[in-house]
């Protein structure tokens, strides 16, 4: 087997064996050995050796490589979509959009580098002020499973454009997609050692995060893991740590004339990607009146008809399996805890086969649950909270340590003005799903949702550091010298 990619060559891992499985069938998709601590060390040292030449190359040369990568991603879009669907359970219609996003990210990242970093000059009385940006060196990229191609790409592309060398540790649940992506980078002509792949589970990640020769760590994943990394690097200011994590995201339903439009956007917010987007709505605030009752009745009715099926089924389902049998079981267990604490099931989640990752979407009214836990249930589990006044809804919506996304569905523009002024989140949408985001805008949020804005336009900010210079081509004595100096 050749599980790892180090120094421009595929190599066998020397750590424990592991495998990924199609969550919709249970069949093995990828099998191999993880990277041991020694393998990780070789990968980091390979990146360090490659860094000097890569960072010394021109921005145009680096951009030419990433543009070739984008072109190859477009050519191989169907193969990528198939790999994403097979390994994650994501329906092909959605996997194709992920592959397209991988290619689209390149031009946005190039634009971001030029506009937010790059080089700028301004004249001074006695010279020229120059602002340049320099790469950090060797950066580790940790990728998630829900978008195993697109989200790591949101770190890797801007890091490479800035001149960094990368060691990529993908999710152990999607190693096959990572291997295919790295092969495309190789075919695009990326020099040996500039991008290295270390496959593996927890121990591989620990070895990479603990390596003393990395200059930065860029992470997209769970808040729990990101918080551990934040604690780990708390005493190491020399490490650039960029975190994009999850959210307990609120969606507030206000007065609307088009109930079906509100229901559609709520379903998209809560259940797209089987609820496995960090921006999915987890808490849905519904007015405690007749209009709220009508909304809930229609929301429950339409949700009950959502199709769930295999990634390559024809016709395509709206939802595929969640990432694993374990994830499915945890979601069902979370539902049972909420029901035991007083929640009312408007639509109960079912895992029809305990050996597979398929679950049906759930709608639970948790209004009467005391001390509701502030946690992200990463799947199709929507919690309904009835409210009396709009200010009450806002107060409860902000009652979270997270701050990734939030949304308001309402016809009244005055409510929107109040909402966007009051809500605490990094992505705040009006009459659009909570998981709708522009690649040309910051992606992320405050609190336990992260500290930087990975995966989009602002990623350039943490991939390079500013270097300020005052320059003069000719060495000259000043017209006057400071008091106390004699020449």
Swiss-Prot record:
Function (record text): Catalyzes the NAD-dependent reduction of succinylglutamate semialdehyde into succinylglutamate.
Residues annotated as transmembrane: none
PANTHER family in alphabetical order: ALDEHYDE DEHYDROGENASE-RELATED
Gene Ontology biological-process annotations: arginine catabolic process to glutamate; arginine catabolic process to succinate
Keywords, in A-Z order: Arginine metabolism, NAD, Oxidoreductase
GO molecular function: succinylglutamate-semialdehyde dehydrogenase activity
PROSITE patterns, A to Z: ALDEHYDE_DEHYDR_CYS, ALDEHYDE_DEHYDR_GLU
Gene3D superfamilies: Aldehyde Dehydrogenase, Chain A, domain 1, Aldehyde Dehydrogenase, Chain A, domain 2
Binding site for NAD(+): 221-226
Reaction catalyzed: N-succinyl-L-glutamate 5-semialdehyde + NAD(+) + H2O = N-succinyl-L-glutamate + NADH + 2 H(+)
Annotated family: Belongs to the aldehyde dehydrogenase family. AstD subfamily.
EC identifiers of the protein: 1.2.1.71
Pfam family for this entry, one: Aldedh
Regions annotated as coiled coil: none
Protein name: N-succinylglutamate 5-semialdehyde dehydrogenase
Pathway assigned to this chain's UniProt record: Amino-acid degradation; L-arginine degradation via AST pathway; L-glutamate and succinate from L-arginine: step 4/5
Active site residues according to the UniProt entry: 244, 278
């Amino acid at each position: 087997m050749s599980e790892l990619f180090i120094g421009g060559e595929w190599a066998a891992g020397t750590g424990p064996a592991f495998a990924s499985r199609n969550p919709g069938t249970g069949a093995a998709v990828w099998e191999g050995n993880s990277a041991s601590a020694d393998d990780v060390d070789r990968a980091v040292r390979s990146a360090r050796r490659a860094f000097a030449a890569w960072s010394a190359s021109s921005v145009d040369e680096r951009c030419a490589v990433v543009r070739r990568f984008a072109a190859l991603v477009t050519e191989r879009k169907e193969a990528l979509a198939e790999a994403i669907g097979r390994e994650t359970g994501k329906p092909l219609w959605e996997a194709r959009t992920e592959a397209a996003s991988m290619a689209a990210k390149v031009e946005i990242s190039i634009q971001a580098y030029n506009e937010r970093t790059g080089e700028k000059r301004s004249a001074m009385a006695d010279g020229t002020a120059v602002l340049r940006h320099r790469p950090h060196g060797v950066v580790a990229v940790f990728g998630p499973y829900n978008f195993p191609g697109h989200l790591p790409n949101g770190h890797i592309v801007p890091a490479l454009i800035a001149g960094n060398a990368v060691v990529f540790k993908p999710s152990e649940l999607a190693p096959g997609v990572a291997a295919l992506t790295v092969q495309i980078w190789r075919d695009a002509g990326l020099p040996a050692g500039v991008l290295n792949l270390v496959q593996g589970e927890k121990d591989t990640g620990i070895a990479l995060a603990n390596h003393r020769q990395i200059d930065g760590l860029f992470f997209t994943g769970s808040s729990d893991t990101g918080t551990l990394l934040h604690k780990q690097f708390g005493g190491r200011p020399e490490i650039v740590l960029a975190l994009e994590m999850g959210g307990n995201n609120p969606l507030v339903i206000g007065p609307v004339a088009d109930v079906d439009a509100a229901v559609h956007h709520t379903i998209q917010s809560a259940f797209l990607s089987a609820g496995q987007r960090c921006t999915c709505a987890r808490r849905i605030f519904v007015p405690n009146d007749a209009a709220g009752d009508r909304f809930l009745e229609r929301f429950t009715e339409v949700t009950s008809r959502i199709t769930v099926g295999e990634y390559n089924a024809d016709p395509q389902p709206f939802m595929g399996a969640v990432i694993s049998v374990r994830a499915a079981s945890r979601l069902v267990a979370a539902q049972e805890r909420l029901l035991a604490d007083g929640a009312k099931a408007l639509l109960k989640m079912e895992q029809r086969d305990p050996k597979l990752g398929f679950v049906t979407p759930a709608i639970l009214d948790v209004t009467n649950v005391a001390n509701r836990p502030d946690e992200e249930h990463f799947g199709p589990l929507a919690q309904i909270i009835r409210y009396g006044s709009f200010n009450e809804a806002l107060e409860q919506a902000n009652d979270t340590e997270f701050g990734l996304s939030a949304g308001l569905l309402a016809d009244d523009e005055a409510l929107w003005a109040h909402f966007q002024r009051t809500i605490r989140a990094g992505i705040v949408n009006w009459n659009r799903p909570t998981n709708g985001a522009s690649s040309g805008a910051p992606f992320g949020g405050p609190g336990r949702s992260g500290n930087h804005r990975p995966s989009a336009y602002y990623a350039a900010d943490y991939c390079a550091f500013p270097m300020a210079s005052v320059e003069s081509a000719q060495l000259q004595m000043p017209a006057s010298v400071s008091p106390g100096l004699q020449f």
